[in-house]
A protein has these predicted regions:
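Canonical Rossmann dinucleotide-binding motif of NAD(H)/NADP(H)-dependent dehydrogenases/reductases
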Residues: 3-33
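Substrate-binding pocket helix/loop in short-chain dehydrogenase/reductase
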Residues: 97-99, 103-108, 208
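C-terminal helical subdomain
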Residues: 182, 201-234, 238, 245-247
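Active-site helix of classical SDR
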Residues: 122, 158, 166
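Short, small/polar-rich loop/turn modules that mediate ligand/substrate recognition or access, typified
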Residues: 174, 179, 238-240
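Short C-terminal tail/terminal secondary-structure segment
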Residues: 93-96, 147, 228, 239-252
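Residue(s) in the substrate-gating loop at a strand-loop-helix junction
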Residues: 142
Length: 252
């Protein structure tokens, strides 16, 4: 097993890619903390993992609340004694708005979830990792963090920021046995579109030009396999990279 007895937090793990990552990590032997705002969904994932012989517990976490993040890490260490891997997966979509249509409230919320919460989680995790002498961070970002036409301006900017945060963190702690990498999924079958409201007709029309080039929609389990690799010792020499998984969509 690639992650035997590793302790892993996965945020946004009640559904979609987070669920697949949590389940995949458990299958590879990790003890998983299933974190999500949707506690019932998180419990269902944790219970399914335990039913299959794995180890997991669920915790309700609003990643925009500092006290929830502190509790998440405190409960993890209290329960398992340490943290080996942090998977920042929680995220929300914008409404495809170009910059002239963005409201301050939308911008602030997108950044609170997609960027600031990631930074705060990494800040707590790196303190633990420095004390332990090791640790791994896997940020599930987006092809929108590498390109300009995969979402609206707010989502795109929020994900570009996480790319920079990922690379800077990898550099800063490369001599401390701490790795930080990212995943840039293309179109994947998840429920993230449920977070979209007041969708921009202009933005959808422009973004749709690129969708015509997409060879296929990916499955959450395909992203989970990459997250397993990056979290494992198989990726011990990989640091500061953002790996695209999109079936060749962005090669054009």
């Amino acid at each position: 097993m690639k992650l035997q007895d590793k302790i892993a937090i996965v945020t946004g793990a009640a559904s979609g890619m987070g669920k697949a990552i949590a389940e995949g990590y458990a299958t590879e032997g990790a003890k998983v903390v299933v974190s999500d705002m949707n506690l019932e969904g998180a419990k269902a994932v944790a219970e399914a993992i335990v039913a299959e012989g794995g180890t997991a517990f669920a915790i309700d976490t609003n990643v925009t609340k500092a006290e929830d993040l502190e509790r998440l890490f405190d409960e993890t260490v209290k329960t398992y004694g340490k943290l080996d891997i942090l998977v920042n997966n929680a995220g929300i979509m914008d409404g495809m708005e170009p910059v002239n249509e963005i409201s301050d409230d939308r911008w602030d919320m997108i950044f609170a979830v997609n960027t600031t919460a990631v930074m705060k989680s990494m800040r707590i995790a790196t303190k633990l990792f420095l004390e332990q002498g090791h640790g791994v961070i896997v940020n599930n970002i987006s092809a929108g963090g590498l390109h300009g036409g995969r979402a609206g301006a707010a989502y795109t900017a929020s994900k570009h920021a996480v790319v920079g945060l990922t690379k800077n963190t990898a550099f800063m702690f490369a001599d401390k046995n701490i790795r930080c990498n990212g995943i840039a999924p293309g179109a994947v079958l998840t429920n993230i579109t449920s977070s979209m409201t007041s969708v921009s007709e202009v933005g959808v029309a422009r973004q749709g030009l690129g969708m015509a080039l997409n060879p296929r929609v990916g499955q959450a389990e395909e992203i989970a396999k990459l997250a397993i690799f990056l979290g494992s010792e198989d990726a011990s020499f990989i640091n500061g990279q953002v790996v695209t998984a999109d079936g060749g969509w962005t090669t054009y």
